[in-house]
Curated annotation (Swiss-Prot):
Quaternary assembly: Homodecamer.
Organism: Staphylococcus epidermidis (strain ATCC 12228 / FDA PCI 1200)
A Gene Ontology BP annotation from the UniProt entry: D-ribose catabolic process
Function in brief: Catalyzes the interconversion of beta-pyran and beta-furan forms of D-ribose.
Pathway: Carbohydrate metabolism; D-ribose degradation; D-ribose 5-phosphate from beta-D-ribopyranose: step 1/2
Localization of this protein: Cytoplasm
Residues noted as binding substrate in the record, renumbered to the chain: D28, H99, F123, S124, N125
Protein name: D-ribose pyranase
Gene name for this UniProt entry: rbsD
NCBIfam families: PRK11797.1
PANTHER family attached to this UniProt entry: D-RIBOSE PYRANASE
EC number: 5.4.99.62
Enzyme class per UniProt: isomerase
InterPro entries reported in the protein's UniProt record: D-ribose_pyranase, RbsD-like_sf, RbsD_FucU
Length: 134
């Protein structure tokens, strides 16, 4: 049995395919994720699993250099923003963009996976940009 934190085979596979600058997204239950082979639906019910728990686990196996967050999270979900910032290392750039731009980035060829959680708080979405480990 696998020893590392990510047990979900689809998430593990998506992370293993990442190269420098590739993207992986973690989304709340309401984000309109394209129905394609990159969709990884973990949502079981409201708040299960929580966005922040999935993010924390993914970060144990993924090297990131930048994250994208919706500008709207600053006012609509300051508590979630604070929790995200606790998990992101100081050397990782945080870029705030319009929520509409985030939706478009889900379709990018650089995006290797869209993870849907059961999160039901507004703007609980993040795009992780992969870095190299050397």
């Amino acid at each position: 049995m696998k020893k590392t934190a990510v047990l979900n085979s689809h998430i593990s596979s998506a992370i293993s395919t990442l190269g420098h600058y590739d993207l992986l997204t973690i989304n709340d239950a309401g984000m309109p994720i394209p129905n394609d082979d990159k969709r990884i639906d973990l949502a079981v019910t409201k708040s299960l699993p929580r966005f922040i728990d999935v993010l924390e686990t993914v970060l144990t196996e993924m090297e990131i250099q930048k994250v994208y967050l919706a500008e709207e999270i600053k006012t609509a979900n300051a508590q979630q923003l604070k929790a995200i910032k606790k998990l992101i290392n100081d050397d990782v750039e945080i870029k705030f963009i319009a929520h509409s731009e985030m939706k478009e980035m889900l379709k990018s060829p650089l995006n290797k996976g869209n993870i849907r959680t059961g999160e039901i708080t507004p703007f609980s979405n993040i795009i992780l940009e992969s870095n190299v480990t050397f």
